[in-house]
C-alpha cells in the first residue's frame, strides 16, 4: 500500500516538472545550497552522513572491509593531498581522467567523451565549484537516472593509499573534478565496487539522458552511413575507437597514425563526386589534436584535387586541430566500434537539428504476477507487461529504396548496480514486438492472451537476451499497430524497468492493459423462493436464534471442505468468515439469516467450481499465474497493477493461492466494488471520502 501511494505522489510530481534538468530531484533529499550554507555559517567542512568515509563505501567483495586491496586506505580531502587543489583547470580534458584501482574504464571512456561537449559537460558537472571561494568541502553533480535528472551531493573526502588517489585522478594530480564525479556516481550506485564492469553506453546515457546504440564495424549494417548522417543531423554524439588486444596496445599508434584504445569523435559524413564516382567520406576528430591520419583523404592527400573546388572548400574550411577526413571504407577497415548517443529533444538547445520524438514508459516485473519470462515459458509469457506502439508516418527519405517508420527501442532495468552489494546483479532481459491483429486494431484495453502468443510469432525482437543494464535495437517497420513485450529470460524475477522509444516521426505509445470490470451476479430472491430442503438444513445449522455467526460459519465450512478430495484446504480462517458475513449482513447484526446464507452458499459453490476448473494439473491448489484467469471466470477484469497487489496479498511463498485465500480475495473484491458503485451512482469513476469513511472501508 505504501508503495502504491509513493508511486502516485511521484507521478504527480513528475507531471509538475520534477525530475527535469532544471528541477532535478535531490538525491536522498540533500539540498546542496542549504548544506553548503550551513557549513559556511558554522565554519565546518561537510561530512556526508549518507555516504560516509568508511569501508562499506568502497565495496563489498574485492574492495570489501577485509580485502587486502583496502588495507592502509585513508580518506583525505584534496586540501590534504596537494598544496593548491583545483576543481577544474582550463576546461576538461582527457588528461584529467586517469584510471585507478577500479575496473570502471567503461565509465571513464564515457567521461572522456563528455569532455568533447562543453554544454553537456556543464549539465553534469556544474563548473562554478571551487576549493577557494565559498569552499565548504561539498560538491554536487547531476546524473540522468531512468527518465529523471538527479542531483547528487558528496563531501570531498577521497580514498587514498600512500598519499595518492586510489581511483580516478588527473595526470598532474592537482585537478579533482573527475575524482569527485566518480565518487558521486559511486554514491548513487551504492559503492565504488558497484562501478566495476559495464558498457560505455551506460555512462553515455547517465551523462546525457540520451539513448545509446553501438555497432561492431567488422559487421556493419548496410545502411550504416545513412544512420551516421541522420545521427549528425539530429545532434547525436558519435564516438569511435580501435580495439586493443593487449595492455601494450593501449595508446599504441598505427603506421597510419591512428591511436588504439583512444576515443575519437565522428563530426561529419558526406558523399562527394570524385573522378566520376560517388565517394563516401567520414570526418573524424582526435579531441587532443596530437596525431592525425596519414592515409587517403588526409589533409595533404591528392584525392582532394579530384573533387569540385567549391566542394573541397566547403568540406575543409572549418577545419579544427586534430580533425581529418577519411573514406568510409577505410573507416570500417581501421576502426572497431562506433557508438551513437542519440540526444533527447530537451538536451538539444539549437533549432538547427532535426530532433527525435521521445516516449518513456515505466513498468515492473513482479514474481507470481507480471514476471512471465521469455517465449520459452508459454504458460506465463503473456502475463508480462504489454505496450502498444502505433506507427503512423513513414520516414521522409527512404533508405536503399526501403520505406517504413524508423524507431529505436531501449529497455533498461533499474537500480541493479545498487543491489550488487545485496548479492543481486543484472537480470538477463530482452523484448519482442508483435503485430496487432486486424480484429483488435484500435483497442488499448485488451491484454493479449496466452492463445495469441501461442499462434503468433514476433515481427521483430531484441538481438539477444543479455545481462546488461540496457537492451537496445533499431527497427524499421511499416505503419501499423504493434505490441511490445519486455521480459526477463526466466520467469519470477522481480525488477523495475523503463522503456524508451525514439522515433523519426511522431508515434503513439502506451501501456496496454485490461480495464477494471466487475460483472457481479445479482440475487433477486425472497425467503419464499428457497426450497424446503435448504430451509431444514439452515434450521439445523443455525440453532435457536435462526442466524449464523462468523464463528458458526467457520465450523460449518470446515466440515464441508473436509469431505472434498479435489480441493486441498484446512478450512476457512475466521478472518475469511468475518468478511463473508460482512459482505451479506444487510441488517448490521453481524450474522446471516436464511436468505443471506442461501446467497453465500450459492457463491461458495460457484467459487469451488471455478477453483476446480482452473486447477488443470489437479493439484488441489492454484498457482498465482492461474489467478488471473480465475478472476475473469468470477467476473472480474483487472489491470496488471492490481494483479500484483492481489498476488502479494493472497499468495504464499511458493506462489500458491489456497481455497481460503481465493474466496477471501473474491469476497473482498465484490464488497469493494459494491461500496464504490453505491457511492458513485452516476458511474463517474471517482468518489470522495472523508478520513473516517476512508479508514472504515480500509479495515474491511
UniProtKB/Swiss-Prot annotation:
Binds 7 Ca(2+) ions. It comes from the Eukaryota. Its cofactor is Ca(2+). Gene3D superfamilies: 2.60.120.380, Cysteine proteinases (3.90.70.10), EF-hand (1.10.238.10). Ca(2+) 7 binds at residues 615, 617, 619, 621, 626. Residues 515-529 are annotated as: Linker. The active site is at 105, 262, 286. PROSITE patterns: CALPAIN_CAT (PS50203), EF_HAND_1 (PS00018), EF_HAND_2 (PS50222), THIOL_PROTEASE_CYS (PS00139). Residues 345-514 are annotated as: Domain III. One of its GO terms (biological process) is proteolysis. Residues 45-344 form the Calpain catalytic domain. Activated by 200-1000 micromolar concentrations of calcium and inhibited by calpastatin. Belongs to the peptidase C2 family. Calcium-regulated non-lysosomal thiol-protease which catalyzes limited proteolysis of substrates involved in cytoskeletal remodeling and signal transduction. Proteolytically cleaves MYOC at 'Arg-226'. Proteolytically cleaves CPEB3 following neuronal stimulation which abolishes CPEB3 translational repressor activity, leading to translation of CPEB3 target mRNAs. This is Calpain-2 catalytic subunit. It comes from Macaca fascicularis. The gene is CAPN2.
